[in-house]
Amino acid sequence: MARSPRRAGAPRLQLPLLCLLLQGATAILFAVFVRYNHETDAALWHWGNHSNLDNEFYFRYPSFQDVHVMVFVGFGFLMAFLQRYGFSSVGFTFLLAAFALQWSTLIQGFFHSLHGGYIHVSVNSMINADFCAGAVLISFGAILGKTGPAQLLLMTVLEVALFGINEFVLLNLLQVKDAGGSMTIHTFGAYFGLVLSRVLYRPQLEKSKHRQCSVYHSDLFAMIGTIFLWIFWPSFNSAPTTLGDGQHRTALNTYYSLSASTLGTFAMSALVGERGRLDMVHIQNAALAGGVVVGTAGEMMLTPFGALAAGFLAGTVSTLGYKFFTPILEAKFKVQDTCGVHNLHGIPGVLGALLGVLVVGLATHEAYGEGLGSVFPLIAKGQRTAMSQAMYQLFGLFVTLMFASVGGALGGLLLKLPCLGSPADCQCYEDQVYWEVPGEHEDAAQGPLKAEEPDTQA
C-alpha cells in the first residue's frame, strides 16, 4: 500500500528539523553559559606569570588527539562489518559523536566546571566530552541497524544527560576511581544499550537476517577500526589521569593488557572455532577487551603481571561470550545485540570494576609511598581505609548498572514513539533506507524490501 503524501514527507523533514533544533538550542546554551577557562582566555592567561609551555594544552592535547581518532575512526569502522550498513555505521557515528560532544560539554560542565554561573572549557573538556560520546557509541552498537537517525539523536540527548549524572555521582559524591571508564563509559554504555535493545525487541527481525552478516571487505574495514582502537587505547585510559607517574603507569598497564587479551582471543577463537579456524568477529572485538578491563585499575599499582593476567582473562571471556552467550541473549532474554557490546564492553567493564575493587582493597602505604595521595587521596588523608574505598568502588558499579538500566528502559520507551519512524523489520541493516548508494537504482534496490510488510516496526 502506498504511503500518503503526509507520511512520506514526514521522515524527509524529521532529521533536518531535529538537527536544526538541537544545534540551535545547543548554540544558545553555549552563548549563555560557556566561556574559556584561564588557560584558553587571552586576557587571563597573559595576566599570569608563566611560560606558554606551562599551558596544559601541551600536556593533554596529544592524548586528546588519540581519543578523538578512537571515537570518530575506531568506533565508526569497527561497526562497519555489516554488508549493507557501512554508510550508516560510519556516518551515524559521525553524527552522534558530533552532537554528543557539544551536549556533553554542557551537561558535564554544569557538574564539573561551573564557576560564577559559567561553564569554563579547556582541553580537558574536550577529552571528557569525547569520553561521553564513546559511551553513546557503545550503546549505538547494541541497536545498530534497527533505528533511524532521529531516534539515535534523541537517544543521545537522554544518554548524555544520564551519563553526566552517573559520572557526577561516582566521581564527585562517592569519589570512586575510574579514570579509564570501566564503569562510567563501558559498563554504562553497554547496559544502557542492551536494555534499550530489549525494549525495542523485534520478533520479526528474521526478515532482515540475511543482511545481518559481513562480507570479506566489510570485515576488513571493521578490522581497520580494531587496529586504530588497539593502538590508541593506552591514550584513552591515561588521558584524564594525573600527569606524571599516574599517566605513565596507566598507559603501560593498558599496553600490556591489550597484548595479552589479543593472545587470549586468538587462542580461544581457534579452540572453539570449527576445525580450529579463527573467527574474525572474535578478533575484531575480543582483542580489545584488555583495554576495557583495566579502565578502572590502570592508574593503580596493578603490576605488569596483573595487567597481563587481567587482559588474558578479558580476551578469553569476551571470545566465549561471542561464541556462546550472544545466541542465548537473543533466544532467552530477547536482547538483539547487533555488535555484541555485552561481550566487548559489558562483561569486561564489570570485570574491570571488580578488578578495581580488588586492587583498591590491597592498596598500602608501602606499595604507593608518597604517591598514595595522588591515586587515593582519601586513603592518604585517613578519611577512608583501603577496604572502605573498595566498598565504595563496588557500590559505584551497582549505581552505574542502575542508571544504565533505568535510562535504557526510558530511552526504549522514547524511541518507540510512532512519530519517530523506525525502519520496518524487512528494512533493517540496509543503507538505502537513509542514504544515496552509488551504483544502485533506488527502485531496483528497494524492490525486495517493498515486497515485505512495511509496517512491522519497533
UniProtKB/Swiss-Prot annotation:
Record Pfam families: Ammonium_transp
Membrane side Extracellular: residue ranges: 35-61, 112-124, 173-179, 241-250, 303-306, 365-393
Keywords: Ammonia transport, Cell membrane, Glycoprotein, Membrane, Transmembrane, Transmembrane helix, Transport
Membrane topology note: Multi-pass membrane protein
Topological domains, Cytoplasmic: 1-13, 83-90, 146-151, 201-219, 274-279, 330-343, 415-458
GO BP: ammonium homeostasis; ammonium transmembrane transport; transepithelial ammonium transport
Catalysed reaction, written as an equation: NH4(+)(in) = NH4(+)(out); methylamine(out) = methylamine(in); CO2(out) = CO2(in)
Chain positions covered by the region annotation Interaction with ANK3: 416-424
Gene3D superfamilies: Ammonium transporter AmtB like domains (1.10.3430.10)
Record keyword 4Fe-4S present: no
Motif (Basolateral sorting signal): 429-432
Role this protein plays: Ammonium transporter involved in the maintenance of acid-base homeostasis. Transports ammonium and its related derivative methylammonium across the basolateral plasma membrane of epithelial cells likely contributing to renal transepithelial ammonia transport and ammonia metabolism. May transport either NH4(+) or NH3 ammonia species predominantly mediating an electrogenic NH4(+) transport. May act as a CO2 channel providing for renal acid secretion.
Complexes and interactors: Interacts (via C-terminus) with ANK2 and ANK3; required for targeting to the basolateral membrane.
Protein name as it appears in the record: Ammonium transporter Rh type B
Gene name linked to the record: RHBG
